[in-house]
Amino acid sequence: MALHRDDICDRIRTLALPVIDSMNLELVEVEYKRSGREAVLRLFIDKEGGVTLDDCADLSRELSTLLDVEDLIPCEYSLEVSSPGLDRPLKSEADYERFSGRLIKVRTYEPYQDDAGNRRKTFLGRLEGLKDGSVVMSLTEGQTASIPLERIAKAQLEFEF
């Protein structure tokens, strides 16, 4: 029985986390994409101070061996390990606390109202942190927004010049 993409990502996450933790790294995201006979498995990692090329190479070697033994991916694939980049996604409550004070972009599933009464799906502003399960932001237009986590489709850091 073929596994669904989300199931593969969940199994990879479960398999990879002990290795990642032992290397004092943080797993940001697992991405699996298949196109025809080709597939790509991407793991995005981070650590305080940023990841190095050696971190990525070391983890790639460790995981390659483990993935070959476990045989979770039903076809040939390429394994890519990298940093999440300057526009790092925010996935966990800890991310919202860690990156408090940074400029972020948030997209909601449906239009949501900011504190000035404007309804929209995209918010750009300074992350103030979490309060009662909501992401609190000072928006670039001067308003504020408090967006419940369950309404957020995507959130990411924004590069500042």
From Swiss-Prot:
Keywords: Cytoplasm, Ribosome biogenesis. One of its GO terms (cellular component) is cytosol. The keyword Cytoplasm applies. Transmembrane segments: none annotated. InterPro entries: Ribosome_maturation_RimP, RimP_C, RimP_C_sf, RimP_N, RimP_N_sf. One of its GO terms (biological process) is translation. It is found in: Cytoplasm. It holds the Pfam family DUF150_C. Belongs to the RimP family. This is Ribosome maturation factor RimP. It comes from Pelobacter propionicus (strain DSM 2379 / NBRC 103807 / OttBd1). The gene is rimP.
